[in-house]
């Protein structure tokens, strides 16, 4: 049986990537620091996924095991040395923390003369996730290890999309996911192009698809959450039942459409269908997704290359309208969640400094006119 190592045994790891790997005939070693989940994987070697739709279909994923990378790093290194595929779903900020283990596994592959090509795919909500991981892994490779990696180890970037809401179950492995899923892998950086997974799309140039996903799903989801929170909604579903929230989301996606058409020559009708599907996904009655989950880490989401500021910058550069994206940014600045560290931090920044200074700091913008537009938009909600 083919072997895969997957870093991150959380809901997305089990409920999305794990399912695809299993359906492609892989035995999966999940790597994580969560004792409860790792122990359960090793006791049962299987888990159930529920599809959030009529009938609530169940899928049993088997041939799985767990490795605690904190307690047993050598087992991770050994697994990396022998595996045929590596994937991650741990969050962009955690990628640097697994780089050394991957590097040691690559060194072991070199020492054991395992020249089977290996692809390492970061399935994260970020542009260039695998390339970023490769930069981190290189820091820990010897000169020989680096040369070996350049020959035999690929880090193809990927775009992934499936809504997996925050959830707690008696069974720590059980996970509920939406029916929709999309996983696109860039072929250019692959070292093992013969190993292609069914249910995964392969594209020569991933960038249009990553931006389509990030600017549509991530921007749209976050718009729903921040606008919904401003008008008092507690869940994404509740937010979209409010017509003013739904109109805001549609208007933001309309601006995103103009950008994607101008930049990547997507067809308007194709994007319209894609965006209608996205809204229907957000409205799935079988998924309870709290606004607080989708709206968490507002400072990160206001970043220069993130889901609001980047499309605003690029629309402005092209002389296109970004009125509704700007309004959403104002809702982000007004977002308050005492349980979210960045929300609290943003509130403190706004108390300590001028709004203009905070806008400059969190967005990284240097365009004085655009900074002023954001300030005006935020103040218009006061």
From Swiss-Prot:
PROSITE patterns on file: MANNITOL_DHGENASE
Reactions that this protein is recorded to catalyse: D-mannitol 1-phosphate + NAD(+) = beta-D-fructose 6-phosphate + NADH + H(+)
Self-association state and partner proteins as the record states: Monomer.
Lineage: Bacteria, Bacillati, Bacillota, Bacilli, Lactobacillales
Key words of the record: NAD, Oxidoreductase
PANTHER family the record matches: ALTRONATE OXIDOREDUCTASE-RELATED, MANNITOL-1-PHOSPHATE 5-DEHYDROGENASE
The protein's Enzyme Commission number: 1.1.1.17
Protein source organism: Streptococcus mutans serotype c (strain ATCC 700610 / UA159)
Gene that produces this protein: mtlD
Cellular component terms per the entry's GO annotation: cytosol
Sites where the protein binds NAD(+): 4-15
A biological process term (GO) from this entry: mannitol catabolic process
Record carries keyword Metal-binding: no
Gene3D superfamilies with a match to the protein in the record: N-(1-d-carboxylethyl)-l-norvaline Dehydrogenase, domain 2, NAD(P)-binding Rossmann-like Domain
NCBIfam families: PRK02318.1-2 (NF002646), PRK02318.1-3 (NF002647), PRK02318.2-5 (NF002652)
Name of the protein described by the UniProt record: Mannitol-1-phosphate 5-dehydrogenase
Similarity annotation: Belongs to the mannitol dehydrogenase family.
EC class (word): oxidoreductase
Pfam families: Mannitol_dh (PF01232), Mannitol_dh_C (PF08125)
UniProt key word Oxidoreductase: yes
A molecular-function term among this protein's GO annotations: mannitol-1-phosphate 5-dehydrogenase activity
């Amino acid at each position: 049986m083919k072997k895969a190592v997957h870093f991150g045994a959380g809901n997305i790891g089990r409920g999305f990537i794990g399912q695809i790997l299993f359906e492609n005939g892989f035995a999966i070693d999940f790597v994580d620091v969560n004792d409860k989940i790792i122990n359960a994987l090793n006791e049962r070697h299987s888990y159930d996924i529920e599809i959030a739709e009529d009938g609530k279909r169940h899928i049993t994923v088997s041939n799985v095991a767990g490795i605690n990378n904190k307690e047993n790093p050598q087992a991770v290194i050994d697994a990396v040395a022998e595996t045929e595929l590596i994937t991650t779903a741990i969050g962009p900020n955690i990628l640097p923390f697994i780089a050394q283990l991957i590097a040691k596994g690559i060194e072991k592959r070199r020492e054991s003369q395992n020249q089977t090509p290996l692809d390492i795919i970061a399935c994260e909500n970020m542009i260039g996730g695998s390339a970023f991981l490769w930069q981190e892994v290189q820091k820990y490779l010897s000169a020989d290890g680096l040369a070996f990696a350049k020959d035999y180890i690929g880090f193809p970037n990927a775009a992934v999309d499936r809504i997996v809401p925050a959830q707690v179950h008696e069974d720590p492995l059980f996970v509920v996911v939406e029916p929709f899923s999309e996983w696109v892998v860039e072929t250019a950086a692959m070292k093992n192009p013969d190993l292609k997974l069914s249910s995964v799309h392969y594209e020569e140039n991933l960038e249009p698809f990553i931006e389509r996903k990030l600017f549509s799903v991530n921007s749209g989801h976050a718009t729903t959450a921040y606008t919904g929170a401003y008008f008092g909604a507690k869940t994404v579903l509740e937010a979209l039942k409010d017509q003013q929230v739904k109109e805001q989301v549609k208007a933001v996606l309309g601006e995103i459409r103009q950008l994607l058409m101008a930049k990547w020559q997507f067809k308007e009708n194709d994007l319209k269908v894609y965006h209608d599907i996205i809204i229907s996904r957000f409205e799935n009655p079988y998924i309870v997704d709290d606004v607080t989950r989708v709206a968490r880490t507002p400072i990160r989401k206001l970043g220069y290359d993130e889901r609001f500021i980047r499309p605003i910058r690029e629309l402005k550069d092209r002389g296109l309208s970004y009125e509704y994206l700007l309004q959403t940014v104002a809702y982000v600045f007004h977002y308050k969640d005492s349980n979210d560290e960045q929300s609290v931090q943003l509130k403190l920044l706004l108390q300590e400094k001028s709004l203009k200074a905070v806008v400059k700091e969190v967005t990284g913008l240097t365009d004085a006119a655009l900074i002023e537009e954001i300030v005006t938009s935020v103040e218009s909600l006061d």
